[in-house]
């Protein structure tokens, strides 16, 4: 316990030292000076730089300045000498008046230290003012019968100085009848009195002249004098007498101040000053003395202020008349005040019952008030009224008391507040009135349900909206107030496509803002029907409903889908055939596409995006029909490649492209002959490449051997050279030249090509396939031919096939078939319309161009006819489809047909997931023949 006690004592000692230091610093920071008054400007008060422990030059460096409190600055700093000097003349009497000490306090700020120093300057008094009387002469009248010892007050002298410099004494000039008596008051003031020492005799001397001198105690001594004229009065033996003993007068209360009422006259038989009469009020109270005034010379009585009959209607007073000898006479004055209508009625509210419920019954008391008038007679009779067309009425319940009642049932929704003006009017002439204004609040009850601004709402929202998007804001207005008008919004429970409505949309219960909780898809559903309910917070709550229908607007969010031609399932590329004898406008094929959007977003247009032979083919703008633009020539290549672009009319437009391969030949043998001619240049090119590689390898080998021999001759031994050559020849012996020749680690890849075409036994048309080039040693391999085979040909069964491994061909996709109604017919005679409107039924007039892929089974058994059976893959006279569109979604209702209000309908049956009855039972394998 000893250690904590010592710590506490040490802490208290430190605190005490800190307090003493602060007191010492505060005392040290207070600087005191003194300066006499009336000094000239620039008078040095003190060396402030020394007292602040600063050099004179530091006053400017440290930005030392005087901080005043808005008063006129009496002192200033001299930055050169570091002294505090006067800024002008200082008058102590003007500054501090009669204060014993005159102190001037201000602060000096040292800005760099941010420290203030208190400065106290005492302004000392100098004897710069002499005692002064208010008048230079004074007349004193004394009756000759006055007895010795009588005292008469004399005027005082005023000296603004203080201390010894102030007034110290009075002196009276020498005489035989009077002496001077000086009295000192409680406040230290010196009051002189004139004392009669000897009786006066008017016959001996009618007047006496005296001089009173007032002196201060300063250096030099200052004084002033006043002359006193003493007049000896004669004896007075007649008193003043009034003409009437009682004066009566009547006056209206509204006469202005200064109105003459009467004149009371008194006479004195004496002569001279003894016969001169002076008038004054004698017996009068203080209130009356403020209302009336009396001329002391003439005796005229007039009003000094406005009279008030209601305050006092009768006044009684006495008037005294005194002559110069001191004799007096008296009379009585009676003043009657007559009433005029100068007071407005006064209305005093006794009870106010506000607010009032809007369902208050008729006759409910709202206000009880008193109305009275201070006037008398008819001037004091009051009549009260209120403005018309209000739901209230006035009743006079008792004398001067009125009640304000409800005249009918109130409706807060029509008027929530009433400003009632009660007018009180007297019956005077002219009548005076007073108005009071009352604000009556009507309390609401929950008698109104929320009401929507519309009977129903239709809202439009573009599809693909972001989640949480604000859709719409419904507003219901409740004419009630406060909680009765606070509306809470909600959605009625409902189910849409098996899911609760709350999974699609939500509503803010406070604001009525409808939000989307998911991204809507026009293709999924196009409108939502919901009920929005608005309930107030009253007791009991009231509610109302409104129907809201949300329409989902289609956006161009789906690109066109190419239905035909489609990529075969076996990975090959379909080929369309066109005879060399085709005339301009010959229908080669037709591109069929659909768009999942609707309206203009699904309106498709076709154009030829790219072609290997410009000007040879054209595409119908709205039909997608690929036709020959000119007659085919012998110089036209066998294989023509076309890229057709399909674009919708949405904003922004979306598009898709499809690549078509057209083989130009009149018959199937022509195709085979053309294929044979195409293989010869390929073999020549391969042989030329092999020759170049052999020559390059030989040259490089010679250079390498020469270099090795030279090195061996110079630096290596003969046996090491022989061993190195043997090892080198052994390493090169096992590399087949048909694959690659290595030159300094670089491999030259041999390119192999594969070609495949499919034929049917009953048709002159063929399916020609040109796969991608196959590279021997790359990571990417083609599935249509093996790596070591330079050419793969798939031929019909009536051609000889070598003993090579057979690769099974994928069967045609049985899901991609057209019904008989959808199967396109012969259309070579039709002409495409590039600028016209769409056909009336796009799916009924050659919508689809089927890929021509021969069926091996039909070619083998020869069961197919030229026209092709319903259950076979045979070809028509022109072309036939090899797949149906049963698995493709029916978007024809989305297709917009310009110039027509019709929509496309599906005539085909729905997909049943089963293969056709005949024609696809046998699968055919294509043989591959190696070309060297």
UniProtKB/Swiss-Prot annotation:
Compositional bias ranges of the Polar residues kind: 816-841
Tell me the segments the record calls region Disordered.
Answer: 803-841, 902-932
Q: What does this protein do?
A: Potential calcium-dependent cell-adhesion protein. May be involved in the establishment and maintenance of specific neuronal connections in the brain.
Basic residues composition-biased segments:
922-932
- One GO term of the cellular component aspect? plasma membrane
State a single Pfam family of this protein.
Answer: Cadherin_2
The entry's protein name is: Protocadherin gamma-A9
Record keyword Protein biosynthesis present: no
Q: Where is the signal peptide?
A: 1-28
What keywords does the record list, in alphabetical order?
A: Calcium, Cell adhesion, Cell membrane, Glycoprotein, Membrane, Repeat, Signal, Transmembrane, Transmembrane helix
Instruction: Give the source lineage, highest ranks first.
Output: Eukaryota, Metazoa, Chordata, Craniata, Vertebrata
Topology of this chain in the membrane: Single-pass type I membrane protein
Residue intervals on the Cytoplasmic side: 714-932
Question: Where is it mainly found?
Answer: membrane
**TM ranges:** 693-713
Residue limits of the Cadherin domain? 29-133, 134-242, 243-347, 348-452, 453-562, 570-683
Cite the GO molecular-function annotations of the record.
calcium ion binding
User: What's a GO biological-process term for it?
Assistant: homophilic cell adhesion via plasma membrane adhesion molecules
Gene for this chain: PCDHGA9
């Amino acid at each position: 316990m000893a250690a904590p006690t010592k710590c506490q004592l040490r802490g208290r000692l430190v605190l005490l030292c800190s307090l003493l230091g602060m007191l010492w610093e505060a005392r040290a920071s207070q600087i005191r000076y003194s300066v006499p008054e009336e000094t000239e400007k620039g008078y040095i008060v003190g060396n402030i730089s020394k007292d602040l422990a600063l050099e004179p030059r530091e006053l400017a460096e440290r930005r030392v300045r005087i901080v005043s409190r808005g008063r006129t600055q009496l002192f200033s700093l001299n930055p050169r000498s570091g002294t505090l000097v006067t800024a002008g003349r200082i008058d102590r009497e003007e500054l501090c008046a009669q204060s014993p000490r005159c102190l001037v306090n201000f602060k000096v700020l040292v800005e760099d230290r941010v420290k203030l120093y208190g400065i106290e300057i005492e302004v000392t008094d100098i004897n710069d003012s002499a005692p002064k009387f208010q008048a230079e002469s004074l007349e004193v009248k004394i009756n000759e019968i006055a007895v010795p010892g009588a005292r008469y007050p004399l005027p005082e002298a005023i000296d603004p100085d203080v201390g010894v410099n102030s007034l110290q004494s009075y002196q009276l000039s020498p005489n035989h009848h009077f002496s001077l008596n000086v009295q000192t008051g409680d406040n230290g003031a010196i009051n002189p009195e004139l004392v009669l020492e000897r009786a006066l005799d008017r016959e001996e001397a009618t007047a006496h002249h005296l001089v009173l001198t007032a002196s201060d105690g300063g250096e030099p001594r200052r004084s002033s004098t006043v002359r006193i004229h003493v007049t000896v009065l004669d004896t007075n033996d007649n008193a003043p007498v009034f003409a009437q003993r009682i004066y009566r007068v009547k006056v209206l209360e509204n006469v202005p101040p200064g109105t003459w009422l009467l004149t009371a006259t008194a006479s004195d038989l004496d002569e001279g000053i003894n016969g001169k009469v002076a008038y004054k009020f004698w017996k009068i109270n203080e209130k009356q003395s403020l209302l009336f005034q009396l001329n002391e010379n003439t005796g005229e009585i007039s009003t000094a202020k406005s009279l008030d009959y209601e305050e006092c209607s009768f006044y009684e007073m006495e008037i005294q008349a005194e002559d110069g000898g001191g004799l007096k006479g008296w009379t009585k004055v009676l003043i009657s005040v007559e009433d005029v209508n100068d007071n407005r009625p006064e209305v005093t509210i006794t009870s106010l019952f506000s607010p009032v419920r809007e369902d208050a019954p008729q006759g409910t008391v709202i206000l009880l008030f008193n109305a009275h008038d201070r006037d008398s007679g008819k001037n004091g009779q009051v009549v009260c009224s209120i403005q018309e067309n209000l739901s209230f009425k006035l009743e006079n319940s008792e004398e001067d008391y009125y009640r304000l009642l409800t005249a009918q049932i109130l409706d807060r929704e029509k008027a929530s507040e009433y400003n009632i003006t009660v007018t009180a009017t007297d019956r005077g002439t002219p009548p005076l009135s007073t108005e009071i204004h009352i604000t009556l609040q009507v309390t609401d009850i929950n008698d109104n349900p929320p009401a929507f601004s519309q009977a129903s709402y239709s809202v439009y929202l573009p599809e693909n909206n972001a989640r949480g998007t604000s859709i719409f804001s419904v507003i219901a207005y409740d004419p009630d107030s406060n909680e009765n008008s606070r509306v809470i919004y909600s959605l009625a429970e409902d189910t849409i496509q098996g899911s609760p409505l709350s999974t699609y949309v939500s509503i803010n219960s406070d604001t009525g803002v409808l939000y989307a909780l998911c991204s809507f898809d026009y293709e999924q559903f196009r409108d939502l029907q919901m009920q929005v309910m608005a309930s107030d917070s009253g007791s009991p709550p009231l509610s109302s409903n409104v129907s809201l229908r949300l329409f989902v607007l289609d956006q161009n969010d789906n690109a066109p889908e190419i239905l035909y031609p489609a990529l075969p399932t076996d990975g090959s590329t379909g080929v369309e055939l066109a005879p060399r004898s085709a005339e301009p406008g010959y229908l080669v094929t037709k591109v069929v596409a659909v768009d999942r959007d609707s309206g203009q977003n699904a309106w498709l247009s076709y154009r030829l995006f790219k072609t290997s032979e410009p000007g040879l083919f054209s595409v119908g703008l709205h039909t997608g029909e690929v036709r020959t633009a000119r007659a085919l020539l012998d110089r036209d290549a066998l294989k023509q490649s076309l890229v057709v672009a399909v674009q919708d009319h949405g904003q922004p437009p979306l598009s898709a492209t499809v690549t078509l391969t057209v083989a130009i030949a009149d018959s199937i043998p022509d195709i085979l002959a053309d294929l044979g001619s195409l293989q010869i240049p390929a073999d020549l090119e391969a042989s030329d490449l092999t020759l170049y590689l052999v020559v390059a390898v030989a040259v490089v080998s010679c250079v390498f051997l020469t270099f090795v021999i030279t090195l061996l001759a110079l630096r290596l031994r003969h046996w090491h050279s022989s061993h190195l050559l043997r090892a080198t020849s052994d390493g090169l012996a096992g590399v087949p030249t048909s694959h690659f020749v290595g030159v300094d680690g670089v491999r030259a890849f041999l390119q192999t090509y594969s070609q495949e075409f499919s034929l049917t036994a009953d048709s002159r048309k063929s399916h020609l396939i040109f796969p991608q080039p196959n590279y021997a040693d790359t990571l990417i391999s083609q599935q249509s031919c093996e790596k070591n085979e330079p050419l793969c040909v798939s031929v019909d069964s009536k051609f000889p096939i070598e003993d090579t491994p057979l690769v099974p061909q994928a069967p045609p996709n049985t899901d991609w078939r057209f019904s008989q109604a959808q199967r396109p017919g012969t259309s070579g005679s039709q002409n495409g319309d590039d600028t016209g409107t769409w056909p009336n039924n796009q799916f009924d007039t050659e919508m689809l161009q089927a890929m021509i892929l021969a069926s091996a089974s039909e070619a083998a058994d020869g069961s197919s006819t030229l026209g092709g059976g319903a259950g076979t893959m045979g070809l028509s006279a022109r072309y036939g489809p090899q797949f149906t569109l049963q698995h493709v979604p029916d978007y024809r209702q989305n297709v917009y047909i310009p110039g027509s209000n019709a929509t496309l309908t599906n005539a085909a049956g729905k997909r049943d997931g089963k293969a056709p009855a005949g024609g696809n039972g046998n699968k055919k394998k294509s043989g591959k023949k190696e070309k060297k």
